[in-house]
Every structure is written in structure tokens, then in C-alpha cells.
Amino acid sequence: MDRMKKIKRQLSMTLRGGRGIDKTNGVPEQIGLDESGGGGGSDLGEAPTRVAPGELRSIRGPLSSAPEIVHEDMKMGSDGESDQASATSSDEVQSPVRVRMRNHPPRKISTEDINKRLSLPADIRLPEGYLEKLTLNSPIFDKPLSRRLRRVSLSEIGFGKLETYIKLDKLGEGTYATVYKGKSKLTDNLVALKEIRLEHEEGAPCTAIREVSLLKDLKHANIVTLHDIIHTEKSLTLVFEYLDKDLKQYLDDCGNVINMHNVKLFLFQLLRGLAYCHRQKVLHRDLKPQNLLINERGELKLADFGLARAKSIPTKTYSNEVVTLWYRPPDILLGSTDYSTQIDMWGVGCIFYEMATGRPLFPGSTVEEQLHFIFRILGTPTEDTWPGILSNEEFRTYNYPKYRAEALLSHAPRLDSDGADLLTKLLQFEGRNRISAEDAMKHPFFLSLGERIHKLPDTTSIFALKEVQLQKEANIRSTSMPDSGRPAFRVVDTEF
């Protein structure tokens, strides 16, 4: 009888603690048990079913994945052992312990979990049954998400599929691409679909590849958002956020007279988006009003990165056939291929002037005429104003008249002295002398916007500040209504 009690005690300890039976206590390593549970009259001499201590543990499974075991009615005896295993307990053989398995329900996954995990917009509508499917298979949320798993998850939601988007209106067409106004079935929001035709011999145009590679890494409130990329055998479709119009259309709608407070807001946002690009070592290289998009709230965003480049060093040789002629700096017009972020700053100055006056500053139709317009207002450069210019072969070939510089205020009377000073700092002959986007944002011209506007996170709009509001235009006419008779949005200049 004592032997039976020892066996019962050891078995109880094994089930309670998950430990093997001590081989040094005189009990055999393998314990014989009657299949019926071991009644008081069991015959220990019969051939037993043998269970090794390790097998007892394997029944429970690994500790990390074992269901929680709740012991019931575990009354303790005076010797610190449970009554079931105590030497003072009844001689009747009973089940050593009674256990109740507690199975935790699967973690319930919410739409917010999905949005945060996959960086999705807050208003996305997930496919029917998608949350329930993930709830049944939730380990995805307990470990890092691999690139492959992320792609699979996005595809299951509907990203990367043409059928997710509805084409509404055709907005424009270029050599390689057509732009449509569309609607997303995932969010019910309007989108711009830039459909790039893939030539069988050439594949995707390098400008499209460049735009995709840069935009997917640029996350800023003043840079157009690339929502999705759809690749088929015949086309590459880029899905952009939809904005109501571009700056050129905004100027037209205002009768080419923009409220000067709004000019300041637009210019600040242009500089803010550009400063972010330059910090990321990206040059836009094609700034013009048609590539600056504006929504009804007044948010301005940089678009069309088809000519943009990532730069690795301050100056590098690139093609000089960039930037629409009116916004092209004189050093590039004269053949320079060594430039950096300063190439964008000249274009900012031209756009600033155009917003303030309603007309382009240098509307040349040829390179020679463009330089003539520049020199007539800013003065023909000399060795004093532009060291080394006289050794430039193209400059000597044109043989321009000796113009004297004119005061910019005489051409842009709506600018105050701070505005004229900022414009002068942007329109410098030499790229190295042009003010940077980061420094331009700190110019006194923007003091009236307050200090908080400089402390916003990159992805936060300036209109998140209650003190920043777009003012109503005096002569604005709406062209964003469906019956206006012309497209209200131009996502990019698609002439690659």
C-alpha cells in the first residue's frame, strides 16, 4: 500500500509541475499503471502499460504553447502536499488531479489594426470577410511583417488590381501616358490614374520608373501621394491622390490675380515640400505651375517626378535638357551640367513672381530669347556679377546687349520689401548663390505665418493650425464642378 501511495504522489507532482520523476527516490523510472485508472484491487503483477516521464510532458505539449491548466479542489494536507497525493489521504485509488483546460479565444483584429500594420488610409473599406479570415489566422500580428507577406496582404485587400478602380473622365494624354480621373472602390475617394503604355521593345519608360522609385519613398504633406501601382503586360498604372486643379488653373480661375496672403501660403508650401525633397537628396528638376497641385483646402503639392533625380553628391553631371524653358535657370541654359538643389530654386523664384503678378517672368520661346529676357531684367552678367561667364563659349556666341539690372519691385509692385528681397535671393545667376529652400522658409517674408508652422511634422498639413487659413479670392470662378466643361485636374505633364 505504501508503494501505491508513493506512485500516486509522484504522479501528482509530475502533472502539477511538469517535471520528470526523480530517479533517486527508489521508484522505477517507468511506472506501471492499470488502464482503468488503478482501482484498489488492481494487480501490480500484471503486464502494465508503461509511460515514461518524458511522455507525460509530451502529452501536455511544449510549455510555450500549452493551454493554461487550472487545478480544481487542490486541498493541501498538513505535509504541504495535496490531499490527493498525501500519505494521509484515503487508500482508495482516484484520479490524481482534475484539470480544466482554458482555451483563449483568437485575438479579434480590427480595421485600425490592419490600417496601422499595412500603413493604409483610415477610410479604407476592407473586403467582406477579410477581418474574420485574419482573426482565425492572427499570428501575422505577433511577428515582423515580411515584404512578401505585406504584398500578399495588400493584394488580398485589392491593391495592385485594375478592377479596384473605376475610370471616370479622361484628363489628358501624352506620348507614353494617359491620365484619367477615377474612383477607388476601397475608399470611394477620387483618384488620378496615370496609365503608362508599355512598348514591347522598350518596356516601361525610364521617366515612369524614376517617378515610381522616388515617390514611393517620399512621404510629405506637400508631395502628391502615390497610392498604388498596377503592373500588367500592356500598361503600368500609377494611382495618385486626386487634387482639384493645378496652380496654372488656379491662376486662370482668379483672373491671374491671387490674394497675396494666399501667394504666401502657396510659396511656403512649395518651399516646404522642396526642402523635404532636398533633405532626401532628390532634385525635382521640372518645377512649373502645371506640376503644382492644389485642393479646395488650399494644400499645394509637388507632382510629376518624371524628370526628378536622386543625387548622391552636391554637384553631379546630368542632362541640361530639363525644366520647362520659362523656368530654366541661366547656367543650365548656357549648357551647364554640374548642378545640385539650386536648379530647383530658380524655378521657385519664377513661380513666386508669376503668382504675385499673374504673368510669367521670362516667357522665351527659344534658349536665346529666354536668356535675353533674363538679362534684360536682371542685367547682362559680367565677370563681377558672374565670375567666369566671359569664358563661356555659348554666352560669347549670343553677343547680348549690355543691359543694366532693373529693380524687381518695379515689375512686381504687389510685393513688399521682404517679398522683393526673397525674390532677389532666388533669382541669382550662379546656383551656389541662390538661397536654399530650408533658408527661404525662414525668410522674414513668412513672419506673419507664426512660429508653429515651422514645427509641424512632415506629414502634417499647415492647415492643421487654426491660425493658418486660405483667404477667399476676389475674382475666383469655379472650374472644379462636373459640368464646368473642362477637366479640373492635371496630375502631370505627360509628355515624357
UniProtKB/Swiss-Prot annotation:
Its main location: cytoplasm. Detected in brain (at protein level). Isoform 1 and isoform 2 are expressed in brain, kidney, lung, heart and lens fiber. InterPro entries: CDK, Kinase-like_dom_sf, Prot_kinase_dom, Protein_kinase_ATP_BS, Ser/Thr_kinase_AS. GO terms for biological process: exocytosis; growth hormone secretion; neuron projection development; positive regulation of autophagy; regulation of cell cycle phase transition; regulation of insulin secretion involved in cellular response to glucose stimulus; spermatogenesis. Pfam families: Pkinase (PF00069). SUPFAM superfamilies: Protein kinase-like (PK-like) (SSF56112). It is a peripheral membrane protein. PROSITE patterns: PROTEIN_KINASE_ATP (PS00107), PROTEIN_KINASE_DOM (PS50011), PROTEIN_KINASE_ST (PS00108). Found in a complex containing CABLES1, CDK17 and TDRD7. Interacts with BRSK2. Identified in a complex with NSF, syntaxin-1, synaptotagmin, SYN1, SYP and CDK5R1. Interacts with YWHAH, YWHAQ and YWHAZ. Interacts with CCNY; this interaction increases the CDK16 kinase activity. Interacts with CCNYL1; this interaction mutually increases the stability of CDK16 and CCNYL1 and increases the kinase activity of CDK16. Interacts with NSF. This is Cyclin-dependent kinase 16. It comes from Rattus norvegicus. The gene is Cdk16.
